[in-house]
Design a protein with these regions (language model features):
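Anionic coordination/interaction segments
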Residues: 1-240
């Protein structure tokens, strides 16, 4: 279940997983191994792509209450491995198949099963056969109250080389759109921009009227991709 602002209160079906990648959230965000400030204005999470999926793996996949034979159910394998009481250190593991993620198979097979049958799990689909998956570890360590170090480590558990793209993602929750009530709307849109960085690194300045400015930097002179966190109306609501 995601956000619901439908006229009928159909919380399970109003905001689908297919819509999630193209639709700006109003009240909360999701992501793999994600963190944010306490108001969830500035967010960070990991996206991945195995070269086989039709979409980026930006969030966990699960069945809604009507799709699962035992109700709502996440169909992924992820583990919170470690954390200090203050969250000054956290460690997370996500297991990402090297084959195309079987979204349709999970939905269709579970929908056909009765409540008396076993659930059809991701492992049952065969995508983990021969250990053809990646173990992706995400670690956070605080160097200071507002200085967080991030380490992402991926291991290929399969018998052969396989493609994997790691896409660390920094974004602002959309609180400036015109569909937000004026009393809750941010007076101006925050900004992400590339700035000059030390040799062998790239850096982004994240500027928000309430939060101030933060710097996001990473090792390697890797390409940066910038997008606006807005709803893709042409894809979701063509002709409207």
């Amino acid at each position: 279940m995601r956000e619901d602002y439908s006229e009928t209160g159909d919380a399970w079906n109003f905001f689908t997983h297919d819509h999630a990648r193209s639709r700006a959230y109003r009240w909360g965000e999701d992501g793999i191994a994600g963190i944010s400030d306490d108001k969830q204005k500035l967010c960070f999470a990991l996206a991945l792509w195995n070269g086989k999926d039709a979409i980026l793996k930006e969030r966990l996949f699960g069945l809604t209450n009507s799709q699962g034979n035992h109700g709502e159910d996440v169909k992924e394998y992820y583990f919170y491995l470690d954390s200090t009481p203050t969250h000054s250190y956290m460690k997370y593991l996500y297991k990402y198949p090297q084959a195309a993620f079987p979204y349709a198979d999970l939905v269709e097979t579970n929908h056909r099963r009765t409540r008396d049958e076993m659930e059809y799990e991701l492992l049952d689909t065969g995508v983990f056969n021969d250990d053809r998956y990646f173990d992706v570890f995400v670690e956070y360590a605080k160097d200071d109250a507002e200085d967080i170090l991030v380490r992402i480590t991926a291991f290929n558990r399969g018998p052969e080389a396989a493609e994997l793209h790691l896409l660390p993602t920094l974004w602002f929750r959309n609180d400036w759109a015109t569909w937000i009530a004026e009393s809750n709307r941010a007076p101006e849109q925050p900004n992400l921009r590339q700035i000059k960085a030390a040799a062998g690194t790239v850096a982004v300045a994240a500027t928000h009227r309430l939060l101030g400015e933060f710097t996001f930097s990473c090792e390697g002179e890797v390409p940066l991709l910038f997008t606006d966190n807005t709803t893709n109306n042409d894809r979701l609501f063509p002709g409207q």
